[in-house]
A protein has these predicted regions:
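Gly/Ser/Thr-enriched, mixed-charge loops and adjacent short helices
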Residues: 1-102
């Protein structure tokens, strides 16, 4: 069996389609377990630490669709992690302080690929 190497420019194609974000948000809102009306009427204020990754795109967009006031912390998706990106207690000092300072209802911290999260309660812990 021969191994064929390809130059990086010959590895395939990709496409940009901004509609997928909205499609994904709509799928989440359509889930029976999401109490959309209750959330929209609750006047929540939430701090989001997107660790400068994809979570900084999706989580604020989802919360805004739910009429949640979203305070963004590290939500520029540039890949420059402002702290260790593992959503563990010892990495939550920035968001903990901001949740308290902003009198937020809670905070959401995600890891870079948004498959794990940590929640910070209104007291910052």
């Amino acid at each position: 069996m021969a191994i064929i190497f390809a130059e990086v420019d010959d590895l395939g194609t990709y496409s940009k389609d901004q509609s997928y974000l909205q499609k994904h948000i709509q799928e989440v809102l359509n889930l029976d377990l999401v109490a959309v009306d209750a959330i929209r009427n609750a006047n929540f204020k939430v701090v989001v630490d997107g660790v400068n990754s994809t979570g900084g795109i999706f989580i604020p967009a989802l919360l805004k669709e739910l009429n949640v006031e979203c305070i963004e912390l590290y939500c520029t998706p540039n890949g420059q992690f402002p702290h260790n990106p593992e959503p563990l207690k010892e990495h939550l000092t920035d968001i903990s302080g901001l949740v308290v300072k902003e009198h937020a209802d809670f905070g959401i911290v995600v890891d870079p690929d948004v498959d794990r999260l940590a929640l910070v309660c209104e007291g910052g812990y």
